[in-house]
Amino acid sequence: MKYTKQNFMMSVLGIIIYVTDLIVDIWVSVRFFHEGQYVFSALALSFMLFGTLVAQCFSYSWFKADLKKAGQESQHCFLLLHCLQGGVFTRYWFALKRGYHAAFKYDSNTSNFVEEQIDLHKEVIDRVTDLSMLRLFETYLEGCPQLILQLYILLEHGQANFSQYAAIMVSCCAISWSTVDYQVALRKSLPDKKLLNGLCPKITYLFYKLFTLLSWMLSVVLLLFLNVKIALFLLLFLWLLGIIWAFKNNTQFCTCISMEFLYRIVVGFILIFTFFNIKGQNTKCPMSCYYIVRVLGTLGILTVFWVCPLNIFNPDYFIPISITIVLTLLLGILFLIVYYGSFHPNRSAETKCDEIDGKPVLRECRMRYFLME
């Protein structure tokens, strides 16, 4: 596996989106505060801090594990950086610095790679993979609740300022980018997975995730208008089910028990919004059950609003929103079927080995125990 110039540009774009997302979240929170909407300001800030703090915890835990594996002592400067919310930026610095060296200093077309050059590419791929996992954590922990909040405010007031539109756009971009970036990193870091070559598989996977996610978020927003307590109870119930599912599957992502417990809590939260294979096994049945429940839940929420219409927001919005929910859900399921029917990373057939090479050894990395697609 080689870290290419295209991969480097994706990493650069990734940090640009990451920084933009943080700036817009802070901007929206401050704007709400100045307008006297203290609850919305606190919620926006809390979502941002929640996602960032969890990402910093995992980042520092991985730094410690990597140093221990290398036989080095844990450095206090790394702890200080993560306490100051600089862990992800530190990782981006190391990844971009080494990635530039790997992508531009060595000619990827030459077959005359020495062992040192191969190790450099492996190191960069591992660093970028760690970043993609952290971004996936932060996106779903912060971006999804933030997007629901902004959609709720938009429908409640019937209009929004530029900062709110910016927050919605950036949240969608962050979710889209982290999802595709995660897919690319997954395939690149695990040699037994087929590479995600071409634009079509990436777009198909992106639309599958984005459409099913948007449909569910709009449904949750409608439920919030119906009854906030019922909506929160449903989300907490789904979170609890996700945590139980993670414990039932006995995930083994972290070496530390406390971090593994946190990981399962985070997995449960992510499962509220979208499905991931949390154990790397055949999940045809669980995925089918997940999206059947998703369809039934969405139709149930829409039925309640159609049978008992509530004058809680501009009724002119309800018909377009209902159509959007149904269409995005159908399109999401359609792209899901196309993706798993044509582009799913089934384990490639075992290659024949000659007497010199022997049987290839699967490379050990964190991604192998992380969320699969």
UniProtKB/Swiss-Prot annotation:
Regions crossing the membrane: 8-28, 38-58, 166-186, 203-223, 224-244, 256-276, 295-315, 318-338
Cellular component GO terms held in the UniProt record: membrane; plasma membrane
InterPro entries: XK-rel, XK-related_scramblase
Annotated site residues (Cleavage) in this chain: 357-358
Pfam families recorded: XK-related
BP GO annotations: apoptotic process
Keywords: Apoptosis, Cell membrane, Membrane, Transmembrane, Transmembrane helix
Record's keyword annotation contains Membrane: yes
Annotated control of activity: Activated upon caspase cleavage to generate the XK-related protein 9, processed form. Does not act prior the onset of apoptosis.
Topology relative to the membrane: Multi-pass membrane protein
Keyword Membrane: yes
Subcellular location: Cell membrane
Protein family: Belongs to the XK family.
Protein name: XK-related protein 9
Species whose genome carries this gene: Pan troglodytes
GN (gene name): XKR9
